[in-house]
């Protein structure tokens, strides 16, 4: 799998057939679709649309998407994690010790969810949000408090 390095502001979308490593903060006007993993190398990543990774998404700063954030494995940020739509991870979701996690719709992780402050799910303002759409589903809420949404801990630890 090839590795691509990016930074700066991109008009349109960013599609990567491999891994993405940031060499500075990255802002993408539309969406980000990466077949491999996204390593922000201490920088922040922001998309006007969705952010999707086949592997992990790791940022030393914040992760922000106007639409959804989805990773085949983990989503980890040194700062906040914010999505206008849903947040989904095949592994864990972790925001920084002085930050929170916010989603317009649901938050789902096969493993743990953790942050230093608060978790908000289902705060979308564009229509009535159902209980299913404001659910935080994870094996365990490891750290942080649910400020808005319904917590559903599965207790299942992936092997």
Language model: regions and residue ranges:
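Intrinsically disordered, low-complexity terminal regions
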Residues: 1-33, 37-47, 62, 68, ...
């Amino acid at each position: 799998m090839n590795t691509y390095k990016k930074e700066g502001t991109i008009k349109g979308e960013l599609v990567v057939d491999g891994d993405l490593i940031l060499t500075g903060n990255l802002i993408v006007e539309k969406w980000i679709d990466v077949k491999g993993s996204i390593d922000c190398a201490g920088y922040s990543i922001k998309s006007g649309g969705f952010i999707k990774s086949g592997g992990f998404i790791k940022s030393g700063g914040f992760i922000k998407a106007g639409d959804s954030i989805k990773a085949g494995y983990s989503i980890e940020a040194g700062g906040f994690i914010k999505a206008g739509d849903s947040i989904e991870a095949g592994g864990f979701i972790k925001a920084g010790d002085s930050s929170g996690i916010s989603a317009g719709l649901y938050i789902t992780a096969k493993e743990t969810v953790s942050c230093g402050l608060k978790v908000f799910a289902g705060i979308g303002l564009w229509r009535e949000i159902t209980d299913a759409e404001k659910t935080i589903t994870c094996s365990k809420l490891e750290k942080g408090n649910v400020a808005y949404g319904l917590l559903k801990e599965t207790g299942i630890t992936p092997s």
